[in-house]
Each structure stands twice: as C-alpha cells, then as structure tokens.
Regions:
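N-terminal secretory signal peptides
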Residues: 1-11, 20-26
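Beta-strand-centric surfaces of beta-sandwich/beta-rich domains
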Residues: 35-380
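Helix N-cap and loop-to-helix transition residues
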Residues: 12-13, 125
Length: 380
C-alpha cells in the first residue's frame, strides 16, 4: 500500500485528541455558551471547521482493478493489513470475514504494533476485540464498537502513532479463511500532542473460573479480591476505557453477583468497588432474571447477547465504556471482578480490556491456544 512520503503541512488541533482520546471518537455535545454575539467560533462543532489533516485509507482492494477485494488466509498464515508511517491517527477499522469454521472469530488473532515496537499493544482474537466474546456474530451498536448487518465489524477507538503503525491478522485455525475484507481509515498529521497515549487491548479468559468454597465461619467474605477474575493488569500511566465480556454458564442460577474491584497504583485495597456484575454493566436486577432477560445495547453499556439466562449453557456478551470517567493510573492498574459473590461460581469468562497508556508497558499473558479459546461448557 503506497502512501505519501510526507504529509501535507498541517497543525494538530489541540482538541483533536485531548486528554481522553476515546471521547473524541464518541462525540461530546457542545456545552452552553454565554449569550453574547462573539465570533461564533465557540458555537461551531469541530466538523464545521477547516480540517488540516490528510485523510487516507488502507484496504484489501484488488490491486489489479478487479473485484477480488479480499485476502485469503491459509492455516498459520499472518497477513499485514495495515502499515503506515506517522505521525497519524487510525480513526476507524472495518472487517468482514467469510470462513467455513464455526469459530473463526476465535481462531483469527488481531495484533497491533506502535512505533516499531516488537511487542503488540493489541493482542486478541478478532471476535473478542469487537465484543463478540463467545465467537458468534450478533448485531449490536455502541459508541466504540459495533457489529452491523450482517457480519460487519467496526471499531471507532482513536489510535494515535508517532512513528509507525502496523496491524496483522493470523489464522490460527485448521481451515482456510476464504475471504478477509479490510478497510482502515486514518489521518496523517504534522505532530501529535505530547500527552497523546497509545491504545492497548488485552485478551484474558478463565475456562472455567475456580470457585472458592467457604466454611460457615467465613461467611463468604472477600475484602481483598485475591481470587477475582482479572480483566487486565499493567504498569505505567494512562487510563482504562472499558471492557467486553463473554460468559458461558456452567451451573444454574444467576451468574453475575460478583463485584468489580479496581486496584490503582499498587494499592493493596481496591480504589473502586461495585455492587454486582449487572450493575457494573449498567443494568440491574439480574438483567431481568431467568425468564425476563431482554438484550440491550446502548452507547456506553450493554448486554447485547443473553440466551438461556441463568441456566447451564447460558450465554452473555456484555460491554461497559468508561469514557465518561476513564479510570486513571500513574504507576499501575489492575481491573478485576468477582465470579459470583466472593468468587463462588465456576463459569467460563472471555474478556478484552481497552485502555490508553504511555510506553513501555507490562508484558501480556501468553495467548491461550485455539482449543482453549473455543467456548465449551465445563461442568464441575
């Protein structure tokens, strides 16, 4: 994919990324202004002002001029779907995939590298990255991720890079991927604000979680969260933007009585403690319970998949965005959640955490093999 050697002279608008890059992607209503004539500049939304960046796209289009606008992926093959020199900002990613394997969303791995780093800042199965954490398509909409009809995957997180950006996909499955379509929109700019941070996304799973048993004397207390499920853990400074979570139930009854606990800057006690899993995802009362659960998908929170709720084999796909109040850290961050009250359940969890931070960052856990990533009921 060819690109200009130098971007056209431009000046990065201070508000373009700001301190919270994700807020730019979601859009924030303009605040009320004093009732004075003024120049009108403060009343104008950003999109009505002159734009100084260079708009570009890299895609899977047919270089011959034909209509074969896709890439096949053989088993074990890695395809570079994006490579650009900076400074720049990826503003939108769109994929759609045609593959015979029922779990190709779990088998294809997405990785992103910033500024020549050999370690990926994003490493996750492609479906999980787009909020399809159980490996099956489900149409939904949110501020930063969506799945459009019928199998279109979209991401609107802003991803700044100073020197370079590189994105790959790897087919770790046993079958050919017949067609991988890609469109990645980005902008070249003359410079980025000093406070611009790098986008990260980390996959984790517990298949299953280990249930903690208590004697009657313990009264099922969990003040320190030591056995909690861990969404992400990192060193450095930055802020958490949110998580997606898939749950496969291995037992009857409500699976979401666990509280979130967030540990900031090496604190041994959680700085943030919630009141239940459905509360963290901004729902309530067991999402409607065994016979009343109704899927929902809003800008900043959702449970876009709920099937066989509160039963063995029950399936949930959930998301929560913290763009209204990103969880900041200066030294470290560990985001966790109980699996059932005081970790008394052994359901399967599959999650991705999304955040921005400075470099360097802590190493990611080793990505589990495909067989372990595929959702399977595991009865105790």
């Amino acid at each position: 994919m060819s690109e200009p050697e130098t971007a056209r002279p431009s000046k990065v608008r201070r508000r373009f990324l700001g301190g919270l890059v994700g807020l730019w992607a979601a859009g924030v209503p303009a605040k009320a202004q004093p009732q004075s004539a003024g120049t009108g500049e403060a009343r104008l939304p950003e999109y009505a002002c002159a734009q100084n960046h260079q708009s570009l796209k890299q895609s899977s289009y047919d270089r011959t001029g034909g209509n074969a606008d896709r890439w096949p992926l053989a088993p074990g093959e890695t395809k570079e779907v994006f490579n650009a020199n900076g400074p720049g900002i990826i503003s939108h990613i769109w994929f759609t995939i045609a593959a015979p394997s029922s779990y190709h969303l779990k088998e294809i791995v997405l990785r992103m590298y910033w500024d020549g780093n050999s370690k990926p800042s994003v490493e996750t199965p492609v479906g999980d990255f787009f909020g399809l954490n159980l490996g099956q398509y489900n149409v939904y909409q949110s501020a930063f991720l969506n799945c459009s009809s019928i199998k279109a995957l979209n991401c609107y997180f802003a991803m700044p890079f100073r020197k370079s950006a590189r994105i790959t996909v790897t087919n770790e499955g046993a079958q050919n991927v017949g067609a991988f379509y890609s469109n990645i929109d980005y902008q070249l700019v003359s410079s980025l604000p000093e406070r611009s941070l790098y986008f990260h996304a980390q996959y984790r799973q517990a298949t299953p979680n280990r249930a903690v048993t208590f004697s009657s004397a313990d009264k099922e207390l969990n003040p320190d969260g030591k056995e909690n499920y861990v969404y992400m853990e990192t060193k450095g400074s930055g802020h958490l933007m949110g998580v997606t979570l898939g749950v496969l139930q291995n037992a009857e009854r409500w699976m979401g009585e666990g509280d979130e606990m967030v540990f900031v800057d090496d604190d041994s006690k959680p700085v943030i403690t919630g009141t239940g899993s459905e509360d963290y995802f901004c729902g309530a009362w067991d999402f409607g319970g065994r016979d009343g659960a109704i899927p929902f998908a809003h800008l900043y929170n959702g449970a876009h998949l709920m099937a066989s709720a509160e039963r063995i084999g029950g399936r949930y796909c959930l998301y929560r965005w913290h763009s209204d109040n990103p969880i900041t850290f200066r030294k470290s961050l560990k985001h966790t959640m109980e699996h059932g009250h005081a970790n008394n359940r052994a359901d399967c969890f599959y999650s991705v955490a999304y955040w921005y931070q400075s470099e360097p960052y802590a190493d990611f856990p080793t990505l589990p093999p495909v067989a372990e990533r595929t959702p399977i009921i595991k009865l105790s």
